[in-house]
Amino acid sequence: MIELKNIGKQFEVNGKKIIALDNVNLVVPKGTICGVIGASGAGKSTLIRCVNLLERPTVGNVIVDGQDLTTLSSQELISARRSIAMIFQHFNLLSSQTVFENVALPLRLSNTPTEHITKKVNELLELVGLTERKDVYPSNLSGGQKQRVAIARALASDPKVLLCDEATSALDPVTTQSILQLLKEINKRLGLTILLITHEMDVVKRICDRVAVIDQGKLIETGSVSEIFANPTTQLAQQFIQSTFHVELPTEYTEQFSSQPTLNSKPIIKFEFTGNSVDAPVLSMASKKFGIDFSILMSQIDYAGGVKFGFVIAEVEGDGEAITAAKCYLINNNVKVEVLGYVG
């Protein structure tokens, strides 16, 4: 449905050329949700704005539904954009118009018959759960409700593609989850292809089928969510995945940590599990094999793309050589091992 081929984008600032996108290649299959994740300034917004040519690439081709947008005339591009909707971090609603009129706006601009507008808008408001708020003005809506209005308005033209530019960044965590759930529902009910950009791996984990990691204008890793979470190949992808873990040992405990081992001290080790290593009893096997004990302090498990992943933080007791051998054994069994400190 969406194919970006060798996309490059340069800006000129004070006489200097800034490379925003560098040879980007990305395919988003029809009916899937793809998330592009990266830090601020990585090129996410530029990339998504290239899809509907709000930013025209310096080089490369943008193919949407089999049509190369970069070859179209101005009039042809206007027509093609009707099948590509977009929502933003800020909702851009008309404050002087009701919820109903905000959603109806694109239909009125395209001279849609009034009876069709009424039917279509009511259907969309039901879809986003705002039927009872249709006569309310934006100033009386919560942030989540405003984004629901923006989504309904974006769907008014029956698009095939929905672009989401940090659509949940301005929302609280609970509202974010409700908007993500709505996008997932829309994807399933309408078969809509969704491309979203975010700096939060939690967003990708919740609703995406595929993910692309962008860094300094380059896509450095792409694949299904299950593939990336099970076997991240870049350090940045690993960092984003780790950010979904909520690791916070009590301060009273961490204050006892030392960075170097001392006589009779015990290491506090974080073990990260992905893919097959989650279900394998590797800690139990290591304990028996090397004669060491694990006192679990904290653990967490989660799912992404149907794949389990998680971590265990444990105080490890045993002979130093045995602990070292156990660490090597676990690493060889696809467990990431990190010594957080020493106690005792």
UniProtKB/Swiss-Prot annotation:
Family (UniProt): Belongs to the ABC transporter superfamily. Methionine importer (TC 3.A.1.24) family.
Protein name: Methionine import ATP-binding protein MetN
Domain ABC transporter residues, every copy: 2-241
Binding, ATP: 38-45
UniProt xrefs under Pfam families: ABC_tran, NIL
EC nos: 7.4.2.11
UniProt keyword annotations, A-Z: Amino-acid transport, ATP-binding, Cell inner membrane, Cell membrane, Membrane, Nucleotide-binding, Translocase, Transport
Organism: Haemophilus ducreyi (strain 35000HP / ATCC 700724)
General function of this protein: Part of the ABC transporter complex MetNIQ involved in methionine import. Responsible for energy coupling to the transport system.
Gene behind the chain: metN
